[in-house]
């Protein structure tokens, strides 16, 4: 299991600049543009409903704009697909100008793809003499098809991502805990970079007027702040501020977890802040971050890569709560208590797309993470008498999957319809 856990962390904890769904669209568009011959006359983008939901209203770093069109146009303009999820970092003024010209031509068409896949991106570019198509499925960088002028350049048939996702079924909380506790520090110290990178964005979020300013307003000084200047509120503020900045288009990289920057924020910053508060060593922090990230990944396996439920508020915050519990001296039993408490608290938090108000969900999740860790370390847990919580923590986690599959079948459709109707009425 050691090698699987290390492989998973290195695959699932990776840097990205901006929200991952529009970046994945930019990545696909960039690949297609690199193959197309001639001047682009038409751009057709086919997306799963979950991708539309998460790309529709989120800020695109360095553009002052939001949404799918500018992200795709930038990918076409930049044509540096080798950068993958950092493709939107350090683009030039000329590249931005060209992207805006593409948007202004009104040649970008966006359509919903009728697919069972939560994450599906298809970008088709046409010129007078050429056509290029790229498909991404299942994970944000899993390119499954590249086609140019009816020639198949690459056809991966989505096998790679599915194989690794299947391995996540082997993850058990007890095994994750033991790995985090016993792994060689040299093998896991790379995970410290996730906290360093994300805390830099948090610092920027606390300084600037990003989004709703959820983080900065929690710790502002003045007559109208109802929050006290205590440790928990500082942790909540730091976490929310990173999301404030990221969702408002801050041009700084974020370390993602399981395909989401907000999940990366939610499972790293509260743990790092708690570690500093408790004066823990780098090794202790690394072990807590390994636990937090792997718990997040495990829960996300049952939620789905994109979900009607909030991955940051549920999976990421639960991971953080486990990491905090570990730093407080908790053992496996306390970790199990912590997970039961968190799922009791936050299991109904919906995902209504990627946008500035994600910072509110991060704040809520972080507050719950602290509260549930505090209960767990004192030996207090939700029990099988309480709602969807089971006697065994593995069953509690699996209940989230049952909830989504059986109870939330139409939630994504309903949310997306509300969002699209609102956009149509606001034109």
UniProtKB/Swiss-Prot annotation:
InterPro entries: Ser_deHydtase-like_asu (IPR005130), UPF0597 (IPR021144). It comes from the Bacteria. One of its GO terms (molecular function) is L-cysteine desulfhydrase activity. Pfam families: SDH_alpha (PF03313). One of its GO terms (biological process) is L-cysteine catabolic process to pyruvate. Belongs to the UPF0597 family. PANTHER family: UPF0597 PROTEIN YHAM. HAMAP family: UPF0597 (MF_01845). This is UPF0597 protein CPR_0790. It comes from Clostridium perfringens (strain SM101 / Type A).
């Amino acid at each position: 299991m050691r090698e699987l856990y290390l492989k998973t962390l290195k695959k699932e904890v990776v840097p990205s600049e901006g929200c991952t769904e529009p970046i994945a669209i930019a990545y696909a568009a960039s690949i297609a543009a690199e193959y197309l011959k001639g001047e682009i006359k038409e751009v057709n983008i086919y997306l799963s409903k979950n991708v539309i939901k998460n790309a529709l209203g989120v800020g695109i770093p360095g553009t002052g704009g939001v949404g799918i069109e500018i992200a795709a146009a930038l990918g076409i303009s930049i044509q540096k697909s080798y950068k993958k999820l950092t493709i939107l970092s350090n683009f030039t003024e000329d590249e931005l100008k060209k992207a805006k010209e593409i948007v202004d031509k009104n040649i970008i068409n966006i359509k919903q793809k009728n697919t069972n896949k939560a994450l599906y991106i298809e970008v088709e570019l046409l010129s007078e003499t050429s056509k290029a198509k790229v498909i991404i499925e299942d994970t944000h960088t899993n390119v499954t098809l590249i086609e140019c002028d009816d020639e198949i350049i690459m056809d991966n048939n989505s096998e790679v991502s599915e194989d690794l996702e299947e391995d996540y079924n082997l993850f058990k909380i007890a095994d994750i805990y033991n790995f985090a506790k016993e792994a060689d520090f040299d093998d896991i110290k790379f995970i410290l970079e996730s906290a360093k990178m994300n805390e830099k964005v948090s610092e920027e979020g606390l300084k600037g007027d990003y989004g709703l300013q959820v983080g900065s307003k929690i710790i502002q000084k003045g007559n109208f702040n109802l929050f006290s200047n205590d440790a928990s509120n500082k942790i909540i503020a730091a976490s929310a501020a990173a999301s404030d900045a990221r969702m408002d288009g801050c041009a700084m990289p974020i370390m993602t977890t399981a395909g989401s920057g907000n999940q990366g924020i939610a499972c790293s910053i509260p743990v790092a802040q708690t570690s500093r508060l408790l004066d823990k060593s780098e090794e202790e922090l690394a072990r807590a971050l390994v636990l937090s990230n792997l718990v997040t990944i495990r829960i996300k396996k049952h939620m789905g890569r994109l979900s009607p439920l909030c991955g940051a508020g549920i999976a990421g915050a639960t991971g953080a709560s486990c990491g905090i519990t570990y730093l407080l001296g908790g053992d496996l039993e306390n970790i199990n208590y912590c997970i039961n408490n968190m799922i009791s608290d936050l299991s109904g938090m919906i995902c209504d797309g990627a946008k500035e108000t994600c910072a509110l969900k991060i704040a809520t999740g972080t507050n719950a993470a602290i509260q549930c860790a505090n209960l767990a370390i004192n030996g207090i847990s939700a029990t099988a008498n309480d709602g969807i919580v089971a006697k065994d923590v593995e069953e509690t986690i699996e209940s989230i999957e049952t909830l989504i599959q059986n109870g939330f079948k139409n939630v994504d459709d309903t949310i997306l319809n509300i969002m699209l109707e609102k956009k149509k009425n606001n034109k």
